[in-house]
């Protein structure tokens, strides 16, 4: 009788598990090798992964409109800055003088003021722009800046003197042009209020310069003082009252001075030799004596 055969020994489960893990590792390694080869072919010889670097947005340009600048002067500043922007970036920006003049040419309805030319409402400040910024967008930002600053004013005193908000804006533009020392703004404003009260011609040289386009570097001649012009407020041939529009675009300090003049009775002022401060008086004799003493005509 042949000997009885034993059944084959079963492989332990732990061994089977290890073998399966090994086979899986081989499969993963094979897949990784194939992916590496394909990636190398697509990416060239450089097998290193290149990091993604975000592209920074171009730095905006900056345009500065000084207080008192007229609409025309702002257009000149736009032209100058646009030229710099073109030189640095190699392309013309949308912002340019001709489109700025066109965007600011027509009168608009301004809340609280009515429909007026934009001279006076183009708030002087520093504005950033890019190559895509349009003149219409810049103008809109200036008008918004004006409204924000104007909202800080209380024009109750001006209204008590029968002056409108637009009148206050006109006065502010004259204050801006006539003063170099900040502490004199309210004094110049007071002279304007007092002369309006006494039905006197304002005698503001800056209004005539604006109306006749006389540069500040040129002297005003006697014949020009007698020129019939709505912006001529001189005592020799000018009209009474305020000029028809602002003569520039005032900043917040001049707006505040126009709404809150100093409580003084001054009617005259003349620039001192330092070309920054003024001599103020309520006496015509004292005014003329000061001018004579310093060789003023």
What are these regions (language model features)?
Residues 24-36:
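Hydrophobic membrane-insertion alpha-helices, especially the h-region
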């Amino acid at each position: 009788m042949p000997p009885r055969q034993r059944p084959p020994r079963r492989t332990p489960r732990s061994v089977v598990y290890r073998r399966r893990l090994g086979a899986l590792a081989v499969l993963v390694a094979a897949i990784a090798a194939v992916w590496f080869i394909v990636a190398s072919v697509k990416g060239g010889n450089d097998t290193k992964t290149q990091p993604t670097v975000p592209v920074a947005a171009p730095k905006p340009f900056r345009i500065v409109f000084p207080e008192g600048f007229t609409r025309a002067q702002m257009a000149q500043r736009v032209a100058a800055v646009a030229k710099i922007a073109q030189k640095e970036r190699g392309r013309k920006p949308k912002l340019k003088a001709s489109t700025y003049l066109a965007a600011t040419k027509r009168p608009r309805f301004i809340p609280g003021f009515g429909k007026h030319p934009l001279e006076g409402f183009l708030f002087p400040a520093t504005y950033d722009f890019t190559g895509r910024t349009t003149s219409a967008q810049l103008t809109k930002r200036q008008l918004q800046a004006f409204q924000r600053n104007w909202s800080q004013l209380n024009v109750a005193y001006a209204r008590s003197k029968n002056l409108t908000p637009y009148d206050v804006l006109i006065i502010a533009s004259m204050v801006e042009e006539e003063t170099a020392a900040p502490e004199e703004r309210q004094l110049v404003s007071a002279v304007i209020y007092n002369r309006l009260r006494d039905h006197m011609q304002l005698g503001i040289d800056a209004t005539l310069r604006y109306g006749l386009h006389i540069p500040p570097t040129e002297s005003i001649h006697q014949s020009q003082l007698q020129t019939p012009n709505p912006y001529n407020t001189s005592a020799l041939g000018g009209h009474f009252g305020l000029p028809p529009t602002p003569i520039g675009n005032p900043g917040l300090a001049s707006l505040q001075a126009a709404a809150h003049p100093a409580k003084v009775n001054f009617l005259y002022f003349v620039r001192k030799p330092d070309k920054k401060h003024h001599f103020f008086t309520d006496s015509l004799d004292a005014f003329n004596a000061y001018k004579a003493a310093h060789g003023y005509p």
